[in-house]
């Protein structure tokens, strides 16, 4: 059903189009009748309301205005050229940056070139300054020469009796000078060379040391008699007879002058004490060395080998029976002195027959 409807619609539209074409073909010969010639043909744009419905399909073709082809071409070429120049500048800048990164010497070359240009500019300015200075010096020298020459000219041209002013003198000078003929002007005279610089002052003579020489001049000097009334006079003879003493140098004075208490350094420092090594100073008697048994291979000494048995009266339990009051320790005294003191004491205090000295004392004295 829908296909049938679509086909009907298409046929109706086709019939309408055919009828419109027939109507347009009938109307067109009437409209194409020759019109009277116009003086200036002008394109008139008519509105859509004035155009009949049969000619509506011709309206778009009549109203189209084609632009100028040259303007369009110029516009597109300008745009393309701008894009090309921008791309070229970007590529050139990127290439320059890449070259500077790969070859850093190029940066130094550019800096050198800029420095050379600055030096050239400075040289030009210096040359200009020198030329200006030369011109100023030449002008000053010329003016000085003119000032020197003008008074002599005035004296020759103007009589002395007639005083004249500056204006009159100038007119007289101009009248006396012969007017040049109609000749080409002569070139200006060359400027005189600049005056030489003034000579440098001579250096001062070296100061000679004052030496008192014993020459004939001193002999010629007569010693003037001393005036008792006036002040005391010092003669040359007194100066020659003066004897000078050697003075101490600054270093010697510093050595002699004691240093202040704040700057004094300690005589013995901690480092000196740390570097000190003490030596053993034990002197053992020969008798004890003989009795002592020294084992060379062992570091620890066995005290049992150093002790020896002594004949001492012992109790049944084994303790020695010694009279401690009569024993001499020998501290601070030599054995000879202890024996002498003991004899003296015995003579002063005789012992009773019951008391008897133990045998240990004699053995102790013999040991000492």
UniProtKB/Swiss-Prot annotation:
**What are the Phosphoserine sites (modified residues) in this protein?**
299, 352
Q: Which residues carry this modification: Phosphothreonine?
A: 33, 295, 354
Q: What is its main location?
A: cytoplasm
- Pro residues bias (residue ranges): 181-208
Task: Kindly state the positions of the motif D-box in this protein.
Answer: 304-312
- Keywords annotated in UniProt: Cytoplasm, Phosphoprotein, Ubl conjugation
User: Locations of Low complexity compositional bias?
Assistant: 350-368
Q: How is it modified after translation?
A: Ubiquitinated. Rapidly degraded by the proteasome; degradation may involve FBXW7-specific phosphorylated phosphodegron motifs.
Q: Does the keyword Nucleus apply?
A: no
From start to end residue, where is composition biased (Basic residues)? 1-20
**In which residues does the motif KEN box occur?**
324-326
Q: Where is this region: Disordered?
A: 1-41, 166-208, 347-368
Cellular component GO terms, alphabetical: cytoplasm; nucleus
A GO BP term here is: regulation of cell cycle
Chain location of the short sequence motif Phosphodegron per the record = 293-299, 333-338
Question: Carries keyword NADP?
Answer: no
Which locations, inside or outside the cell, does it occupy? Cytoplasm
Could you tell me where the Polar residues compositional bias lies?
Answer: 166-180
Q: What does this protein do?
A: Plays a critical role in cell cycle progression.
PANTHER family linked: P300 TRANSCRIPTIONAL COFACTOR JMY-RELATED, PROLINE-RICH PROTEIN 11
Q: What is this protein called?
A: Proline-rich protein 11
Read off the lineage from the record: Eukaryota, Metazoa, Chordata, Craniata, Vertebrata
